[in-house]
Amino acid sequence: MKQVWKRLMAGVLAVMMMICMVPELTTKAASGLDTQMVFQCGANVTGILDITGTLTLTGTGSTFGADIWYSRNNLWYDDENDIEYQYRINRVVIGDGITSIGDSMFVNCTKLNSVTIGKDIKTIGKWSFRNCVMLKSIDIPGTVEKIDKGAFTESGLRTVTLHTGLQYIMSGAFEDTALTNVTIPENTVNVETAAFGESVKNITISKGVAVIQSYAFPAENAYVDVLADDVVISAWAFGEGTTLKGKAGSAADRFVKDADEGYYRFEARPITVVFNANKGSCQVQKKSATPGEYYGTLPVPVRKKYTFAGWYTSKTGGAKVMNLSKVGNDNHTLYAHWKKVSVAKAKKPTVKSTAKKKAKVTIKKVSGAAGYQIRYATKKSMKGAKVKATTKTSETLTGLKSKKKYYVQVRAFKKDSTGKRVYGSWSTAKTVKIR
């Protein structure tokens, strides 16, 4: 009888051990790793926390928000065993299909240091990552449209990457963090009051950003690059001493001018001046210039058989621009204007044989001429003629043949913008008999 009883008890114990092992086998199969805990995180969202501290959320739709009891986050609390799993979560992976992160969901998860956000998340809820002090950086994908109130306040964030698609950054979203730099992505609709903390001192407002509310960036002596020319900036949006860089005449420029004198500074964004040589050539094709300042040194283009007439605002006509002209607010092109080199035909020179084998040539001045050429020969056809250049209107020819008749012509030349000579027509020949 005792033997039967022992066998019966052994069988019961074996069955009980198998029953106890079922949950462990199930969780291993579900996660691929040993599982610490499985959580119901939304109506259709499940969270599995493995032994490495990685919490993987899968499912569809929104997650639950969390109730906070003092420092305890009840979403991650196992009241049956009195275990606060919030302190065991090191990494969060939010799968595709999940559309929002609930309010206060990860509050006080003080060991959390990595968050991967799925491609379907549209909203990051209020206070969702508050006091996640080990979370140093996060990349928020462009599918996220709204970062709600206080979402990352008092977290350890040092860097955040925001993408085009984000619409709203609500009050306190990044307040009391260690962020120092931030770029507000293109077409963001609204950056609310106190969205960022006093450590953020390098700010870029991208094109298409619509509204920056009062005290959105309270840091003093910050530097803001405003690429959105028409952004609405509310009074006191930035801390005292902040420099705003933007297009001259833009909303940023007006904002600084409307504020108390000296409270902010404005730095005009340099514009680009393009030089169009207009059938000529120019070594300098563009330069950077500051609106409201002088153009300063301008390049000098060149063109064969033309002189440079200056830079103008239009290809034909327009206003002339010189070194001391003031630069406008927008990128623009200046066009070279040209004057064709025209040299008048020289008049017949006066030629006299003043001594043996010599002749003096007197040239009637041609307006604007840089110099002259004298051509002389013993044949009327000028075959075998010699040519002499001069910048004077009187020149003596030497080494001529005595008793010979010479034909003498002159022509003027000017120099074009390349420095080369452009000649006029030869004059009528003057004859002279040499002594």
Task: Please report, for each region that a protein language model flagged, where it lies by residue.
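Extracellular low-complexity, O-glycosylation-prone stalks/linkers
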Residues: 368-387
